Regions:
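Short secondary-structure transition hinges
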Residues: 103-142, 163-164
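Amphipathic alpha-helical linker/stalk segments
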Residues: 65-93, 124, 144-152
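Hydrophobic alpha-helical connector segments
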Residues: 79-107, 162-169
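Short hydrophobic/aromatic patch on the recognition helix
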Residues: 23, 45-55
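Basic, helix-initiating cap at the start of DNA-binding domains
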Residues: 1-30, 35-43, 60
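Base-recognition residues in the alpha-helical recognition helix of bacterial helix-turn-helix
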Residues: 28, 52-56, 68
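Short coil/turn motifs that cap or connect alpha-helices
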Residues: 33, 47, 56-58, 86, ...
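C-terminal peripheral helix-coil segments that are non-catalytic and often amphipathic
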Residues: 1-3, 100, 141, 145-153, ...
Length: 229
């Protein structure tokens, strides 16, 4: 009996998943640049010819992994933003979801710093790249929602421009996280601060940049304490 289209697609998805899992393992161990298609084929137990049936290049594999990673990040951040009723707790959750993301997937964290310009999207743009762009836009929308809630609650400056502030907040939090992990020993020697102390201190500075002056003292009651790293 011939295989149905649904079974063919299910089998193709199974093979793609195996290839992507092998590639993700190798990228984490050896970096993207240090991994070859031959190694992906060996670890996934497929021939290189079979790999190319499902993915045109190593770059396309990375595009799919990046989308998967960004979609998971969106789901974590969306939960953090929508399930916390306290503005301060929401900010803390947002910061430390991004800290956890850096720890879990530093490669994709770095890729998330690259902006995806919707004006550059064309018919030739790979679907995984388009999907990643959509995930980024959903993250930005949630951050803007978080900021608007703060404005509506009378906590955040009312004259805040949402789109620039969203980009600033994302860039500030992710930038501090990168510094904390990549310059950990320098921070310890020069500032006499642990990575956790550095993160807590700078997250508080970022938050203070959002708050109305009369609200700032409330933040001390909800300290942004970093979980064990």
């Amino acid at each position: 009996m011939p295989m149905t289209e649904s079974k063919k697609e299910a089998l193709a998805q199974f093979h793609r998943k195996n290839i992507l899992q092998a590639a993700q393992t190798l990228f984490a161990q050896k970096s993207f640049a240090g991994t070859t298609m031959d190694e992906i084929a060996t670890l996934s137990q497929y021939s290189k010819a079979t790999i190319y049936v499902y993915f045109k290049s190593k770059e396309e594999i990375l595009q799919h992994l990046t989308y998967s990673s960004m979609q998971k990040l969106y789901e974590h951040l969306h939960k953090a933003i929508t399930e916390n009723t306290s503005f301060f707790e929401c900010f803390k959750s947002l910061c430390y979801e991004l800290v956890s993301y850096y720890q879990r997937e530093p490669l994709y964290f770095e890729l998330s710093q690259k902006t995806i310009n919707s004006d550059d999207v064309s018919k030739e743009t790979p679907q995984a790249v388009k999907d990643t762009g959509n995930a980024v836009r959903m993250i930005n929308s949630d951050i803007a929602f978080f900021l608007q809630n703060g404005i509506d609650a009378g906590i955040v400056h009312s004259n805040l421009k949402l789109l620039p502030a969203t980009f600033w907040l994302w860039g500030s939090i992710t930038g501090i996280i990168r510094l904390a992990f990549q310059k950990e020993m320098y921070i310890l020697r020069a500032m006499e601060m642990t990575k956790i102390e550095f993160l807590d201190y700078n997250f508080k500075l970022i938050l203070q940049g959002l708050l109305k002056p009369e609200i700032e003292n409330l933040y001390d009651k909800t300290k942004c304490t970093c979980p064990a790293l």
